[in-house]
A protein has these predicted regions:
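Glycine-rich loop at the start of a catalytic domain that most often binds anionic cofactors/ligands
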Residues: 67
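Core alpha/beta structural scaffold of self-assembling particle/tube/pore-forming proteins
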Residues: 1-59, 75-408
Length: 408
């Protein structure tokens, strides 16, 4: 019998009210959560107005053979730095908290999820800052790198970007000194572009070569590795980097490919300059440089694979896959690929000499209510705030980098 256009079958569409939706468990996040550098640094207490301590820079003069020598006092420099403030915040409606108190009401309890996400956001932002240029900069717009999509929406091509600095949903400022807010709505790692939406009422128009900053962070970040391991002039922690025993060790590859020989050369030259055996104990590769070096080491098997644990006791359950690269004379060094390191670079450090200084009250703000939920005075909602006070200590003499490597 021929079917009629008036007929219907029992189907998902015609009787959809009879069917249930099988809600699955809350899914794994699909974005960068690595906190490699933070995990490898010792946490030291920060108290007082600023940190101030002496650092010896040479021997006490007065040695000789055969007769009494002339004498000279040892040379010292004063290390000084002040704390900075970093925050992560979110608002939660009180009604939403109440309606999500059980598994029947929601996938996750809103007492827990925002706190988890805030801690997650803070960890990412801290990792970004620790690898950064000390001034809050995320990147720079390339020449002819602005496409106006209309309505305050722009697609920006980035100049030699560190894509890990950009995440959808984060807010940024564009151009030095400008405070208009833009939301990052899309990130394309393959094309090195981001799409941003300007906040309502703002007037800033992005232009080529403009610098992009994390919101309200221009010149407010802690000291970062990209700054300290590339300094060739000026001061670092109140000490001139012109001093031989204070500036970092650097090697420009001038677009050549990294090789085991170059890697070993950099380690040995730093050791020779500093005068300490195994001056570095840890290095982080841009992904392209790690790929190039491992391709050459594969045949010789001059490395071991290990699980790199965290020095931070709070992260004792966290580990990353790393390799220990064996080199003549310079010994072995732990190496790991890191998204926050530019593709053309390799960064070196002695983690025993570096540290994070943080105030005891850093963390969730709980003084007002005894919980992380801070009551809003004018609205039926709570604010959750994570506050961190402190500074990063990266003495340049304990740092190094190989830069300008081939990325093709």
């Amino acid at each position: 019998m021929a079917s009629s256009s008036l007929e219907t079958s029992f189907s998902l569409t015609s009787v959809s009210e009879l069917f249930k939706t099988d809600f699955k468990s809350y899914q794994q996040a699909v974005y960068n959560e690595d906190i490699i550098l933070w995990s490898q640094l010792e946490k030291r207490p920060y108290t007082g107005k600023e940190q101030d301590f002496p650092k010896p820079f040479d021997y006490s003069g007065g040695v000789s053979s055969g007769s009494l020598p002339k004498k000279k006092a040892a040379g010292y420099e004063k290390i000084k730095f002040s704390s900075i403030k970093m925050y992560a915040m979110a608002d939660v409606e009180r009604e939403a908290v109440a309606l999500s108190m059980s598994d029947k009401g929601a996938f996750v309890r809103l007492m827990e999820e925002p706190m988890k996400k805030i801690r997650e956001s803070f960890a990412w932002n801290m990792e970004r800052a620790l690898h950064g240029t000390s001034d809050g900069k995320l990147g720079t717009i390339a020449t002819s790198g602005v496409t106006d999509n209309g309505g305050g929406n722009y697609t920006l091509t980035l100049s030699t970007p560190v894509i890990a600095n950009f995440e959808e949903g984060m807010f940024c400022n564009i151009e030095t000194g400008n405070t208009d807010l833009f939301e990052i709505t899309a990130v394309d790692p393959d094309l090195s572009t981001i799409t941003v939406q300007r906040e309502s009422g703002a007037t800033q128009v992005p232009a080529q070569t403009d610098e992009i900053f994390m919101q309200q962070s221009e010149d407010n970040d802690p000291y970062g590795l990209a700054d300290m391991n590339s300094k060739t002039s000026g001061n670092a922690y109140n000490v001139s980097t012109a001093l031989r025993k204070w500036h970092s060790s650097q090697l420009n590859l001038s677009s050549k490919s990294i090789t085991p020989q170059i890697f070993t050369q950099h380690l040995l030259r730093h050791e020779k300059r500093v005068g300490k055996k195994k001056g570095f104990n840890f290095c982080m590769f841009g992904y392209t440089q790690m790929e190039k070096l491992m391709n050459q080491l594969e045949d010789s098997k001059a490395y071991d694979c290990i699980k790199l644990g965290a020095k931070d006791k709070a992260l004792a359950h966290v580990s990353w896959d790393a390799v220990v690269i064996h080199t003549p004379n310079a010994g072995s060094i732990t190496a790991i690929a890191n998204r926050f390191v530019p593709d053309s670079e390799v960064w070196f450090m002695n983690t025993d000499e570096c540290a994070i200084y943080e105030a005891p009250k850093s963390g969730f703000v709980t003084e007002d209510t005894g919980t992380p939920l801070l009551r809003s005075q004018d609205e039926d909602k709570f604010e959750i705030r994570w506050a961190w006070y402190g500074q990063a200590y990266f003495p340049p003499i304990s740092l190094g980098r190989i830069y300008g490597g081939s990325v093709t």
